[in-house]
Regions:
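Short glycine-centered segments of the SAM/dcSAM-binding site in methyltransferase folds
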Residues: 20, 92-94
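A short glycine-rich, Lys/Arg-flanked "PGG" loop and its adjoining helix->strand segment in the class I
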Residues: 79-91
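Class I SAM-dependent methyltransferase SAM/SAH-binding core
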Residues: 2-55
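C-terminal lobe and adjacent flexible extensions of AdoMet/dcAdoMet transferase-like proteins
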Residues: 155-162
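A short SAM/SAH-binding and catalytic strip from SAM-dependent methyltransferases
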Residues: 64-77
Length: 162
């Protein structure tokens, strides 16, 4: 399992013990906190690496699956990140994204567009549209589940059909 944008390792306790995890992040400071969590929880199945998710230092089809939580709308090149995730995941493997995407509801979508400049300065895109993003990468959602009250955050699971 590859976790892209592992940050401080918030998800690490959620993975089953038999699952080998490779976590990457661009931020050394975040990785230091994740490493503390690895040591604290005695997670021998976790490897952490500093890496740009748009140019991953992994071979093609190296992972069974990949996940990115709260990452895709916070990176400068979400298409590049998803392309790389697709490249390193084996055919038939899962690509899971938990993220905020632009709402399909017209009023909410317009509000997200209006606040987008402020959100961008804060480090994330409030109006990132899901469907065009996935189409550019050649992915289609098998599962698309809304995960909060306002339906802006969605759990997307795609099967890598190369």
């Amino acid at each position: 399992m590859l976790e892209v944008g592992i940050g401080t390792g918030l998800n690490l306790p959620l993975y089953p013990g038999h699952c080998r995890i490779t976590g990457i992040d661009l931020s050394e400071e975040m990785l230091e906190k994740a490493q503390e969590k690895v040591v604290e929880l005695a997670l021998n199945n976790v490897t952490l690496k500093a890496m740009d998710a748009t140019v991953m230092d992994f071979g093609d089809d190296e992972f069974d699956s990949a996940v990115a939580t709260y990452t895709i709308s916070a990176v400068p090149d979400p298409v590049g990140v998803l392309r790389e995730m697709r490249r390193v995941v084996k055919p038939g493997g899962g690509i899971v994204v938990l993220n905020h995407f632009r709402s399909h509801r017209p009023v909410v979508g317009r509000i997200e567009d209006l606040v987008a400049p402020v959100c961008t300065r804060l480090g994330w895109k409030s109006n990132l549209p899901l469907e065009p993003l996935l189409q550019q990468v050649g992915l289609a959602p098998e599962i698309d589940t809304k995960v909060n009250l306002f339906n802006g955050w969605r759990l997307i699971k795609c099967v890598n059909r190369k």
